[in-house]
Amino acid sequence: MKNQVDLVRSYNDKDNVAHFLNSTLNKGQQKIVKDDLLTGKTKLLYVAPETMTKEENINFFKELEISFFAVDEAHCISEWGHDFRPEYRRLREMMDLIDETKPVIALTATATPKVQSDIVKNLGLRKPKIFISSYNRPNLYYEIQPKINLEQTNKSIVRFVQQHKNKSGI
């Protein structure tokens, strides 16, 4: 979540435009996030499902003017998914407690048809629009390099990281 928030903030001159709320934050940090939300400074909030299921947070979220709910990594909802997390299956219940009238978007890059169906059912989505695209996207570059030995591999990784500062690469 932190890296997503950092990316959003990099496009804006205000650090409080986006926040995350999860168990890694201490009480003081949580208070700052909640204060920014209450004053309307924060426009985008990332919340871990485990955090969203806490009653105190549900009551807090009810006080906010929420535009919509976005469920990222939605495949985690499905018991058929590769990353199943039980708290994800309670998201619809939590969203209904907060504001059942708000729209929901569910996002994933790894849902089989069975997982897609489970997501739709579990989130109670009615006539959802489903968009599917290829993994092979023109903005991605693929390269496979042989692993000669550990020392050479480590040097190659270090060289790659140094040559591509502030960029992605696996």
Task: Give the positions of each predicted feature.
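Conserved helix/coil segment N-terminal to the catalytic DExD/H
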Residues: 25-68, 76-82
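Conserved strand-helix element at the start of the C-terminal RecA-like helicase core
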Residues: 1-4, 163-170
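Conserved catalytic network of the ASCE P-loop NTPase/AAA+ motor domain
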Residues: 10-13, 35-40, 59-64, 95-102, ...
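Inter-lobe coupling/hinge region of RecA-like P-loop helicase motors
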Residues: 137-145, 166-170
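Post-DEXD/H (motif II) to motif III coupling segment of the RecA-like Helicase ATP-binding lobe
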Residues: 62-63, 67-132, 151-154
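Conserved nucleotide-binding/hydrolysis micro-motifs of P-loop NTPases
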Residues: 1-3, 25-27, 51-53, 75-76, ...
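Conserved RecA-like ASCE P-loop NTPase motor core of nucleic-acid helicases/translocases
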Residues: 46, 104, 168-170
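Conserved nucleic-acid-binding Ia/Ib motif block in the N-terminal RecA-like helicase ATPase lobe
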Residues: 2-47, 130-131
